[in-house]
Each structure stands twice: as structure tokens, then as C-alpha cells.
A protein has these predicted regions:
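A general sequence property marking short-to-moderate contiguous segments
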Residues: 23-49
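Sec-dependent signal peptide recognition
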Residues: 3-10
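Cyclophilin-type peptidyl-prolyl cis-trans isomerase
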Residues: 167-183
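Glycine-centered signal
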Residues: 1-2, 14
Length: 186
């Protein structure tokens, strides 16, 4: 089985329900996909399960970069699956590379809980402006961070935590986008 490139998040809380429910009527992974994702991520999910057992986690998130999918996992079972868009620059952890880091992460900071849907954030601050949702499958010049920000912290020293590669210091997020329809067609 081909090893997938992945970013695994250990969430101490469930993501914002409105984000998680955004595509629930569009995508439902089949049993074969479920088994493959779980088997491919056993090492990470075992670590996550140990934290879950201690009561630290409600769910885990597995992001499969090669498939451009986010999976919500609990007790090694996929609950939901969503399309995502990772960095157009590829995978990597080097500071200022604009690449998507791999490995285990946790959601350290949640921003935007009270923000209106489609609110634009700049440098994690609410601008009180609303993004226009693009209804075509295009890549706009704007790269708005919208609705919510889940700021990630790396958990693997030397891979996504530490000087020059630290995901939190690189401002790595899961966030909303105004190009929502493009996610469905990736």
C-alpha cells in the first residue's frame, strides 16, 4: 500500500460544527476508503487513541494531502470526510516556505467563534468585512482567510516543532475560504 502524505491533528475539541457540516451532503467515504485511511494512519491514530483514553481528545483529524481530504476520526472510525486545499507550494516545514507541514499537530488556538460566516481575517484579526463567495471553479488572486481559524501546533520535534520549522510560529491554520466551490472539484 502506498504511504500517504499526511497531517494528523489531535483535536482537544471538535471543530466548529458549521465548518464540519459544510459538505456533509456531498461526500460520504465508502468502507474501502475508511479501511485504507485508518490502516495508513495506524501509528498516528494509536498515539491519538492513547490521548483519547486519558480524556484529552474528543476526535482526531487526518488530512490526506495526496487526496486533498480531511477525515474526522473517532475510535479509529471515520465519522466524516471533507474536501480541502493544501498549499500550492507542496509539503514542507521550513519557515517562510508557504508549504503544508506533515506529521502530528494539535489545534492550539481557535479564532473567530463569534464571527459571522464568511468574515475575512487578516493576521488573525476580524476585519468585520465579508468575503464574496466565488461560485465558479477558479483560483482568485485573493487568498482570504475566512470564517474561522484553527491555529495548529506541531507535536514532532525536528519535523514540525522547533527552530525554523515550527508550525505554530509559521502560522499554520485550517481556515475557511471564499473559494468554497473549488474544493469540491479538486
Amino acid at each position: 500500500m502506498e504511504k500517504i502524505k499526511k497531517l494528523v491533528l489531535l483535536s482537544t475539541f471538535l471543530l466548529f460544527p458549521e465548518i464540519l457540516n459544510a459538505f456533509q451532503d456531498i461526500i460520504n467515504p465508502d468502507v474501502t476508503t475508511n479501511r485504507w485511511i485508518i490502516e495508513s494512519n495506524t501509528k498516528y491514530l494509536n498515539k491519538a487513541s492513547a490521548r483519547s483514553f486519558k480524556g484529552e481528545l474528543e476526535a482526531e483529524i487526518v488530512v490526506d494531502i495526496s487526496e486533498q481530504r480531511l477525515y474526522l476520526v473517532k475510535n479509529k472510525k471515520i465519522l466524516k470526510s471533507y474536501p480541502i486545499s493544501s498549499s500550492k507550494y507542496g509539503e514542507g516545514s521550513i519557515q517562510n516556505s508557504f508549504k503544508t507541514p506533515l506529521g502530528m499537530h494539535e489545534i492550539k488556538t481557535k479564532i473567530g467563534h463569534d464571527a459571522k460566516e464568511n468574515t475575512i481575517f487578516v493576521a488573525r484579526a476580524n476585519t468585520n468585512k465579508s468575503a464574496k463567495i466565488i461560485k465558479d471553479v477558479i483560483d482568485t488572486e485573493d487568498d482570504h482567510v475566512t470564517s474561522r481559524i484553527l491555529w495548529l501546533d506541531g507535536l514532532e520535534l525536528g519535523r514540525n516543532k522547533g527552530e525554523g520549522i515550527d508550525s505554530y510560529n509559521r502560522y499554520i491554520y485550517i481556515h475557511g475560504t471564499h473559494e468554497e466551490l473549488s474544493l469540491i472539484h479538486i
